[in-house]
Amino acid sequence: MELFSQSSRPVAKVMKSIRPVDFMHYVLVRFFQHNCTQIAGSLTFTTLLSLVPMLAIGLSVIAAFPAFAEFSDRIKEFILTTMVPEAANKVISVYMQQFADNAAKLTAIGIAFLGVTALALMLTIDEALNSIWRVSRLRPLLHRLLIYWSVLTIGPLLIGASLSLTSWLMTASRGFTRDIPGGDIMLLRLSPLVLTSIAFSASYLIVPNRQVAWRHAIAGGVAAAIGFEIMKEGFAFYITRFPTYQAVYGTFATIPIFLLWLYLSWLMVLLGAVIAASLSSWRFREWRDDPNARGKQFFDALRLLGILGEALKAGKVETALSLQQQLMLSPEEVERILELMVKANFVRQVQEGGWVQILDPAEIRIADVYRLFAFRPEALRGTAGGDTRLEQLLDDIAVGIDEKMSLPLSQLFTSAEPEPPAEMSA
């Protein structure tokens, strides 16, 4: 296996040359590649329709638990101060209160329709984050609906518990912060930042249908929360110092201000997601984009089959994360390789995200892997346009592949293993 372990050395060399400026450039490239500006616009429109239903459902859940009933007003205040710029939250809070009061008077059928609207927002978020993580297979729809309905019902309780804990911590810490100038104010400003960081990190960790490293999720969540707070201050400064919208729209200025704020907020959420997703693939970007490594996927597929073949002998199951670590590949690269192998019936996913090889290595030739990942002449014969010379060339290439790559994987990896040392004679 020495032949295949050496291929990771160029990758390890590249990992040492990570520069923050290059990483931010990579993040911005991915941000626009995933059309995050258009997705933020779609989420803004869906949020406008879903915000009141989500608030109504959340408050009804809170009302069902007397222990958190006293936090109902504080939850609304927390949502407004977090989601709405200070210059506009007074007017919007009045409208939100009226909408929530009207929604509370609806029947069970009416609330169910509101729930559908709220779930539509969550499904849109689900698709957006999975697209950023380049996930090709989403969770089953019923599974996703159950998860997000649980979030709608349990989320308000968690917010209430967080506010209760925050209130207790602030009361308990006054003895420590009393002697620190501005200590209480600093604690008040840090609490929303911490709660927002936790919310973003949990979303980046749970929503993508992929195993996300918790360090990457936290990094993206903290970055998004810090950017969110900075943007909130900047937006409030712009609205108060440059009242362009008030001058143009008059009393209706709250509407475009709120829409613009929602759009910028979703841009920040998506940027944090791109940062979290980029951390897993950035280390291997230069090696993967090397023009001299266009056949690298074929070589990586051989290495992956070698690992699964050894696991098959030992009766073990390899997870996607262990494959990434052993091959030093990004999650996207491993997933693309496994998808093609599943279609070729080389491997299969078992319970709990494990992967096993279902075809005997003696039955898989190197030519089979080459045709799957590099070049399949038979598939291009119809594009020759009837040119007999090109058709003959493709036939010759196919014959050459079969002749030069007829070795089965069982013999390839056996021959690659180092021979045991000879015994010393007495």
UniProtKB/Swiss-Prot annotation:
GO terms for cellular component: plasma membrane. Keywords: Cell inner membrane, Cell membrane, Membrane, Transmembrane, Transmembrane helix. The keyword Ion transport does not apply. Pfam families: Virul_fac_BrkB. The chain crosses the membrane at residues 48-68, 106-126, 145-165, 187-207, 217-237, 255-275. It is a multi-pass membrane protein. It is found in: Cell inner membrane. It comes from the Bacteria. InterPro entries: UPF0761_bac, Virul_fac_BrkB. Belongs to the UPF0761 family. NCBIfam families: yihY_not_rbn. This is UPF0761 membrane protein Nmul_A0452. It comes from Nitrosospira multiformis (strain ATCC 25196 / NCIMB 11849 / C 71).
